[in-house]
Amino acid sequence: MSTGRYAPSPSGRMHLGNLMCCLLAWLSAKSKGGQVLLRIEDLDTQRCPRSYADAIVDDLAWLGLAADGPTPPVYQSDRSEIYQRYFDELSRRGLVYPCFCSRSQLHAASAPHRSDGQVIYAGTCRGLTPAEIAERSKTRAPAWRVQVPDEVIAFEDGHMGHYEENLARDCGDFFLRRADGVFAYQLAVVVDDALMGVDEVVRGSDLLSSTPRQLWLYRELGLTPPKFYHLPLLLASDGRRLSKRDGDQSLENLRAKYTPEEIIGKLAFACGLQASPAPATPQALARTFDWSQVPKSDIVLPENLF
């Protein structure tokens, strides 16, 4: 039985982009007779109040996309001790080191950058001696990075096809824990998906480039990776990427204007799952769902669809 998951970050109310990901995760799992679990990705508790998490649970139930468990959902903010064990495993093997670089140093014009604008860490702190680490620790708490190999990690995405990266060249040593002690997304998501028994992950294509480093972490930690399906991004009619700041596209406002079936039907139409924006239920869509129906390029919402 396939096990998918929702993994929302409760930094605001859900918008249509979040909903598209949840809908396709639900359809992908249910079309295989599977289940969908819920995990709340609230590592940064200052930005992720529980009230937003409660609203997400309510929104999903109202739409007919309620998770199959667990109850209550898994909260990443409750799992620091678990992440610490896996962090310590990598540290014991000499793969983790402290990084004292400031944000301005990391984003200096001379720093190598990816094509998407992300900084590739140059390894500035990788070779610090114990004495240098002790001296720098007097004035600045370090973040912690993991050292990646000069190795190509490739995989076949269930929707986007072949993707690969050379970790050293295209990714660089990445954060496992912030200076304030909060564990990084890259470590937490790998540990959680493995321990929850998730075997398929549906998420946005903005996370496609995170997958090689996560697959490497799965391997290094002796964990079984899921099958990945990366989605096109959902854009507003003017080409903007939807965000939680787009109040008019939030579920809070959409619930006041439409029924659940109307929202699902309009979104299914935008995703290529049906020929018109007629009202639909997730259960009806699951009976005919196939990944070949979903575009690979970004989806622009037709004007006045919502």
PLM regions and their residue ranges:
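Short, surface-exposed, polar/charged, turn-prone segments marking secondary-structure boundaries
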Residues: 32-33, 64-68, 102, 126-127, ...
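Active-site neighborhoods of enzyme catalytic cores
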Residues: 52-53, 57-163, 167, 278-306
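Non-catalytic terminal extensions that flank enzyme cores
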Residues: 1-13, 31, 36, 134-135, ...
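N-terminal Rossmann-like or analogous alpha/beta NTP/dinucleotide-binding catalytic cores
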Residues: 1-114, 205-206, 210-223
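Active-site cores that bind ATP or allylic diphosphates and position pyrophosphate for catalysis
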Residues: 104-243, 250-254, 303-306
